From Swiss-Prot:
Belongs to the PTH family. Hydrolyzes ribosome-free peptidyl-tRNAs (with 1 or more amino acids incorporated), which drop off the ribosome during protein synthesis, or as a result of ribosome stalling. Catalyzes the release of premature peptidyl moieties from peptidyl-tRNA molecules trapped in stalled 50S ribosomal subunits, and thus maintains levels of free tRNAs and 50S ribosomes. The record marks N9 as: Discriminates between blocked and unblocked aminoacyl-tRNA. SUPFAM superfamilies: Peptidyl-tRNA hydrolase-like (SSF53178). This is Peptidyl-tRNA hydrolase.
Length: 207
């Protein structure tokens, strides 16, 4: 059994924010794989199903980003699972838009959702890092992640959510590198990883 956590902030005010791309991917997994209806528990919303024969619970913490760890800890405690069975899908400003990387453990790079989760369950969980680009200067990061995806960005966001959801069974099976590779190749094939498309809208990619 594995716990897939999507990070974001609750409410319509935030639903299209870059910070909410974790929610978006988790929602797409539930839709595309016929998971159960969402229900309120563990200080969030959960949906149950299976990916490639592996039992999965999806969790969207409704605590707001900075307290996401409380919901994750409650769910992990209920299911008696360790860090190794937790995968967290989150926005990553250090990656160009549409880029995906997967890693276990490591730093939190200033991400308050990851900071909260690490404080509650430890640091050695899987992170699925979903690139949303960097605004170019540190002072603009807050407004960037809490800003909505631009209209020009929506095609790659939709494609990334669909492709990540279609290949999520690889994460369920522990094939993290294969997941990242398949997502990269599929996004590249759709033309979303071309150099001239990495700089979505007026955003600059951090060097």
């Amino acid at each position: 059994m594995r716990l897939f956590v999507g990070l974001g902030n609750p409410g319509t005010k935030y639903q299209d924010n870059r910070h909410n791309i974790g929610f978006m991917v988790i929602d797409e997994i539930a839709r595309r794989h016929g998971f159960s209806p969402w229900r309120r528990r563990f200080q969030g919303e959960t949906s149950d199903g299976a990916l490639d024969g592996e039992r999965i619970t999806l969790l969207k913490p409704l605590t707001y980003m900075n307290e996401s760890g409380r919901a994750v800890q409650e769910a992990a405690s209920f299911y008696k699972i360790g860090q190794g069975e937790v995968a967290v899908f989150h926005d990553e400003i250090e990656l160009p838009p549409a880029k995906v990387r997967v890693k276990v453990g490591g730093g939190i790079a200033g991400h308050n959702g990851l900071r909260s989760i690490s404080a509650h369950i430890g640091n050695d969980y899987l992170r699925v890092r979903l690139g949303v680009g960097h605004p170019g200067v540190k002072e603009m990061v807050h407004g960037h992640v809490l800003g909505d995806f631009a209209k020009s960005e929506r095609p790659w966001v939709a494609a990334l959510c669909e492709i990540a959801a279609d290949n999520a069974g690889l994460i369920a099976k522990g094939k993290d590198a294969s997941f990242a590779n398949k997502v990269h190749l599929a996004m590249q094939a759709k033309g979303f990883l071309d150099e001239d498309k990495k700089k979505s809208g007026d955003n600059k990619v951090a060097k």
